């Protein structure tokens, strides 16, 4: 691991001075070779898949691990989309002339060496490497042992693209050591790695949070809420809350808890919950919500427990609570939320403004689905992940989140007096 770190640190200097043309050339070459080697990628990936089946992995795991022609084409298209993104490196914001005569600005520069730790999705090898490459960083990729053959081949393709553009192949390295001790060492290599970006389940993130010495860009949970205010448009509330929960269940920006103002609950809950039950969503409800729904003929309701309010289901399960007002809703979010994404449905501007100002989450929304908390939807292009921390990056992390700002001073011989 130390040798990998040394090589990455050396390569990061070359990447920092690489031109946009070089970086884009590398990305386009990688996209071309990914398409050319689609069958080989699938064959190698099948080795990983068969091994996972022998090891008893479940169907969802196998699905994440499997690379299909569609998956591979999506990777190639993603590379081409990153080429189209503006290169942030070297850009200087507005220069401000100071009283002394000097001009002061800030230049965007790479972070240096980024470590990506991820689990069973081999497409992350391409996606993460591409974003790090475009932002002028070197990257060390440590994927799950279950995808080692796929990741090794994809790394070879990436390094071929780097060489074709005259960039150091060590700018992208895949850790082929499958021992978990490699992760333990990687997250303490402060002399070589500037930031760790973990992509995986809660147990992985929790372990890294406890053991890492290298700073991380991460989120632990996506416990996202939507609050339907007393002044909400009912049709809008049904449409938005349906989408927030059922458009896809697994993403971290899917709604997990619905909060409903008691004054509008009898008007909106019956219609909305019929939509949910028709789609097979299990409803875990508090006493007031149960009363409202049972009065309208609903059955098969589950009593919500304390654990439900703090659970990221990633499944067709929804917790619902009826609240007295916006204050109770925001207090619930503050107590149980994960500071990821929370939304209010209301036509009351004062209530909307309060929610935006007082809810302490990375993304706060008015009259929109929490599913919009995504790098592509925010116009960032691809994203390396989502952060619910407050320092360095917050929310969806795109190219700018893989950079920092340094001060630049332009003078004309000025001296300090």
UniProtKB/Swiss-Prot annotation:
This is Gamma-glutamyl phosphate reductase. Belongs to the gamma-glutamyl phosphate reductase family. Its main location: cytoplasm. Catalyzes the NADPH-dependent reduction of L-glutamate 5-phosphate into L-glutamate 5-semialdehyde and phosphate. The product spontaneously undergoes cyclization to form 1-pyrroline-5-carboxylate. The keyword Protein biosynthesis does not apply. SUPFAM superfamilies: ALDH-like. One of its GO terms (cellular component) is cytoplasm. Its EC number is 1.2.1.41. GO terms for molecular function: glutamate-5-semialdehyde dehydrogenase activity; NADP binding. The lineage of its organism: Bacteria, Pseudomonadati, Pseudomonadota, Betaproteobacteria, Burkholderiales. It is an enzyme of class 1 (oxidoreductase). InterPro entries: Ald_DH/histidinol_DH, Ald_DH_C, Ald_DH_N, Aldehyde_DH_dom, G-glutamylP_reductase_CS, Glu-5-SA_DH, GPR_dom. GO terms for biological process: L-proline biosynthetic process. Keywords: Amino-acid biosynthesis, Cytoplasm, NADP, Oxidoreductase, Proline biosynthesis. The gene is proA. It catalyses: L-glutamate 5-semialdehyde + phosphate + NADP(+) = L-glutamyl 5-phosphate + NADPH + H(+).
